From Swiss-Prot:
Organism field: Homo sapiens (Human)
Residues annotated for Zn(2+) 2 binding in this entry: 894, 897, 916, 920
Binding-site residues, Zn(2+) 1: 880, 883, 903, 907
MYND-type Zn finger ranges: 880-920
Name used for this protein in its record: Ankyrin repeat and MYND domain-containing protein 1
SMART domains recorded: ANK (SM00248), MORN (SM00698)
Database matches in SUPFAM superfamilies: Ankyrin repeat, Histone H3 K4-specific methyltransferase SET7/9 N-terminal domain, HIT/MYND zinc finger-like
Pfam families in the record: Ank_2, MORN, zf-MYND
Protein keywords: ANK repeat, Metal-binding, Repeat, Zinc, Zinc-finger
UniProt MORN repeat ranges: 2-24, 25-47, 70-92
Disulfide pairings: none
One annotated GO molecular function: zinc ion binding
């Protein structure tokens, strides 16, 4: 029965309606729906007073029950947002609600996972929260354009017209909005009735709201709260404090809140039975989180309690729920599995330490009890435990040792090896799983192992009960642990009650070997947890704070980790933020040292989309030279360089930008073979070897880094050795003779490199632009080499006898290299000129050189009747035929034949001795023969 206002033959306005079941409602109506403020009562005495939306509870309201009172936000008849449930004893359950359960508390768990405890990742945290906006929900966009939509048809446009969505006056036939489409215009009418005489929720007034937690459900809750932010209940009930995680203004915790907090702590402890009982009785939600978004699932996963993880997921926990910092349970496990200490140094991120000089004198390390105080986390990078079961101890670098003092020991073995746990010789050769079991005095493998495992409980490095009946220190023995020994020690330690050392643990429980075994066990357990989360649907692409989990596995060089993530759909088109050069996983993998980098690159290339993706480091400079070079003393006088007939012109300029993965691999100096293998993989997948970064091509980078294997691979795979480089680098031949990179290879290797470049098509006659200040000139690679040579004025200009022995060697090496390049240039000129008519070329040279030279010295003239200018003169390259220079020198022709040019008396004499003595006579004979022919013609005429 209805009593109230009508309109359009429908309930419209204020009224009261009761049902035969005893339920009743009095409040506002709109089009036969309970819509607006009102009170709904049930036969059992419970009632709800608040906002209704199309006959559903939505917005802030108060739910009165027999023994409880709830005040909070609703949506579609369900609790959906901040709320407070009050009990008769005065306690209150405060937090964010979803249906009948708390899903986020206002209390923070002290032991929760937080990125604030990992300052090494602070530079990666560049993510800024998005701003909450409701206007986007009201927009109905067309989507794809007509040309892009493969299923475009004209009737699609009707879907955007509210007048065509429903028949006219549809309310006459039905008002059941649950089964009818909701048009945009009708939704605006409904919202206008709800927010009558109030600021519309779509008007962004006051300070902006930012999304606190990016979990999809919590984003919807935050938007729902933002929509009703101007309601009086939002302020009077202190709902804003709940969103901010502030609980100080409320009564003591109620039962649901207490159980939720305790369940998070029990998940950390691994109390499966207690959590199972709570979830079975529905006392708490499996998806509950503390004030910072630290969920029960995250607590169980980070502590490797896989049984609880399975239980929570079976009970509906969201495996991809994020914390307020943006971390999922999977990303937390990856951050623990790959600490920053496990990351490999690489050239992509510029994390390779600068080489340090070794100590001049041996250092004797001082062993003390502090050696035993290393925490468990530091062992993550000392013990490398791949997921498939192969183990390798990788001790950190240690100081040099003095020669060992030989001595004797009784019985060939120790009576008490309790010190072995704390005195394993980290300074000896690396302890690998495939190494011999024991070297030196420990001959019996099994007995030695039992002694190690058994006697560690009787004595340690600092124990007063240690007995060592030998005059030889344990440090004097080189002990290598095999895979079997590590597995057995780890198995024995797995029986310990404590999974990790605690502050109350005695000193012998902190032994190095024991903690290594515990670390191995914990890593294996966490690896199983990671695999479980991925198998249960964890998204490896969801979390980007501090970085995507694929980056963690790549940076740590874990092949199995990368393979696992790729098998579960990890994206490879991700990158760092612009502040970190937008590096991709392929960039970092190409720079990883060791065989792991090769395998990871191969895995990524099978899933990669753009092998030539560029980093945003186009403004960076490739390691400036260690030499403090002054401006070159070589004078530039706008020399034109070689004529165009001597070289082939470039068809297109190379593309320049940030580093590609190929640049990363070619820049490496750590492992030539692995770098070569990575380059081969990249090229086989279509990497472009002719892109520039910082003026360098991959070929010039490999030359600068001294990797001959990569140079050979690039040239074999079609890299262009004549690619013009920018930023004053010239070409690959110029880089080969640059002083900045001369320390990368010896003299024989430099000469072999030049030969290899020329044999693969490098043109030493290619013009090279040289600039210094406002002056410039065009020369060749030889001129570039001399230009750089004269920048080191100490060696280039000082008298030879005043140089130090090392400087003399440097001077001679540089001169030898430049002379060899001059030889190659001369041979290239001769090879090019051999394609032309030698007589005509010689006449052209004489025609151009004789007039300029006769101003100073009278010489022979051309035969009469041979006017070169009228018949077309061949432009020839003017350079010193001995040293190869064409810039900054004064060139003079041979006074006898005018066939060559030299720059100095030294070059003239040396050229005469080495090659020109014979050629000069031949050229003079040509002139004599031409004169005779010319004379005969004159006599005949």
């Amino acid at each position: 029965m209805y009593q109230g206002e009508f309109g359009l033959n429908m309930k419209l306005g204020y009224g009261k309606f009761s049902w035969p079941t005893g339920e009743s409602y009095h409040g506002q109506f709109y089009r036969d729906h309970c819509h607006g403020l009102g009170t709904y009562m049930w036969p059992d005495g419970s009632s709800f007073t608040g906002t209704f939306y199309l006959s559903h509870r939505e917005g802030y309201g108060t739910m009165y029950m027999k023994t409880r009172l709830f005040q909070g936000l609703y949506k579609a008849d369900q609790r959906f947002g901040p709320g407070v449930e009050t009990y008769p004893d005065g306690s209150q359950d405060v937090g964010l609600w979803f249906r009948e359960q708390l899903i986020k508390l206002c209390t923070q768990i002290p032991s929760g996972f937080s990125l604030l405890r990992y300052p090494e990742f602070s530079s990666f945290i560049t993510h800024s929260p998005a701003r909450i906006s409701l206007s986007e929900e009201e927009k109905t966009e067309w989507g794809l354009q007509e040309g892009q939509d493969p299923f475009f048809y004209d009737y699609k446009r009707f879907l955007l017209n509210d007048n065509l969505t429903l028949p006219p006056e549809m309310y006459v036939y039905s008002t059941n909005s649950d089964h009818l489409p909701m048009t945009s215009s009708f939704r605006k009418e409904l919202d206008a009735r709800i927010f009558l005489n109030e600021i519309p929720p779509f008007v962004e007034d006051g300070e902006p709201w930012f999304i606190i937690n990016e979990t999809p459900l919590l984003v919807k809750i935050q938007k729902q709260t933002y929509k009703f932010r101007n309601k009086p209940a939002h302020t009077s009930w202190n709902m804003g404090a709940i969103l901010e995680g502030k609980r100080s203004g409320f009564a003591p915790c109620g039962p649901k809140e207490q159980l939720s907090m305790e369940m998070i702590l029990k998940a950390e402890e691994g109390n499966h039975e207690w959590i199972c009982r709570i979830l079975k009785d529905n006392f708490a939600s499996a998806d509950v989180a503390d004030a910072k978004g630290y969920t029960v699932l995250a607590a169980a996963a980070t502590h490797c309690h896989n049984d609880i993880v399975n239980l929570l997921l079976d009970c509906g926990a969201d495996v991809n729920k994020c914390s307020d910092e943006g971390l999922t349970a999977l990303s937390m496990c990856f951050l623990l599995h790959y600490p920053a200490q496990s990351f490999k140094p690489n050239v992509a991120e510029r994390t390779i330490p600068e080489p340090q000089e070794p100590p001049k004198f041996p250092v004797v390390p001082i062993l003390s009890s502090s050696f035993m105080d290393t925490n468990l986390e530091s062992l993550y990078y000392e013990v490398n435990v791949p997921s498939q079961g192969s183990y390798e101890l990788r001790p950190p670098p240690a100081p040099l040792l003095l020669p060992r003092v030989s001595g004797s020991h009784e019985g060939g073995h120790f009576q008490d090896t309790g010190q072995c746990g704390g005195s394993i010789d980290h300074r000896s050769s690396s302890l690998k799983g495939d190494s011999p079991l024991v070297k030196g005095s420990l001959g019996h493998v099994e007995s030695g192992l039992e002694d190690v495992l058994g006697n560690t409980d009787r004595g340690s490095l600092c124990s007063a009960e240690t007995k060592f009946e030998s005059n030889v220190c344990v440090c004097d023995f080189s002990i290598e642990l095999s895979q079997a020994m590590l597995e057995r020690s780890a198995q024995s330690h797995s029986l310990l009650k404590m999974a990790s050392p605690s502050p109350c643990t005695s000193s012998f429980d902190k032994g190095t070997m024991r903690r290594m075994a515990l670390s191995m066990i914990e890593r294996r357990k966490r690896w199983r947890t990671i695999k479980l989360l991925l198998r249960r649907g964890a998204d490896p692409n969801l979390c980007c704070v501090p970085m995507q989990v694929l980056f963690l596995a790549v940076k740590a060089g874990d092949v199995d980790g990368v393979r696992l993530l790729l098998e579960h759909g990890a994206r490879t088109d991700i990158c760092f933020p612009p502040q970190l050069s937008t590096l991709t996983p392929l960039h970092i993998a190409a720079a990883l040292p060791g065989e792991e980098g090769v395998q990871i690159v191969e895995l990524l290339l099978h899933a990669i989309t753009d092998v030539d993706a560029k980093a945003s480091d186009e403004d960076d400079t490739y390691k400036p030279g260690k030499l403090d070079l002054l401006p070159s003393s070589l004078k530039l006088s706008n020399e034109p360089g070689p004529p165009q007939a001597y070289y082939s012109t470039d068809t297109a300029l190379p593309e320049e930008g940030g580093r590609t993965a190929l640049h990363m691999a070619c820049e490496r100096e750590d492992d030539n073979k692995c770098a070569r293998d990575i380059v081969r993989l990249l090229l086989s997948h279509g990497a472009n070897p002719n892109l520039l970064w910082s003026g360098h091509s991959p070929l010039s980078l490999s030359i600068a880094s001294g990797n001959e294997l990569v140079v050979k691979e690039l040239l074999t795979q079609g890299a262009d050795p004549n690619l013009p480089l920018t930023k004053g680098l010239g070409s690959a031949l110029c880089v080969a003779c640059d002083l900045t990179y001369e320390h990368q290879r010896n003299m024989d290797s430099k000469l072999a490199l030049i030969d290899r470049l020329i044999s693969h098509g490098a043109d030493i006659l290619k013009p090279v632009m040289l600039r210094q200040g406002e002056k410039e000139a065009v020369g060749t690679a030889v001129d570039y080499g001399y230009f750089r040579f004269f920048q080191d004025r100490r060696i280039a200009r000082c008298p030879f006898h005043t140089l130090m022995p090392a400087e003399r060697e440097t001077f001679l090496a540089r001169k030898r290299l430049l002379e060899y390049m001059g030889l190659q240039l001369r041979q290239a000129v001769f090879a090019k000129e051999s394609q032309w008519d030698p007589t005509w070329l010689y006449l052209c040279k004489r025609a151009e050189l004789i007039p300029s030279h006769r101003m100073k010295k009278k010489g022979p003239s051309l035969p009469r009747g041979l006017d070169v200018k009228e018949q077309g003169q061949i432009p020839f390259f003017k350079f010193c035929y001995q040293c190869g220079r064409s810039i900054g020198v004064r060139l003079l022709p041979c006074p006898r034949c005018y066939g060559i040019l030299t720059c100095s008396k030294y070059c003239k004499t040396k050229a005469w001795t080495e090659f020109h003595k014979k050629d000069c006579g031949d050229l003079v004979a040509i002139v004599t023969q031409l004169e005779q022919v010319s004379r005969r013609r004159e006599e005949f005429q």
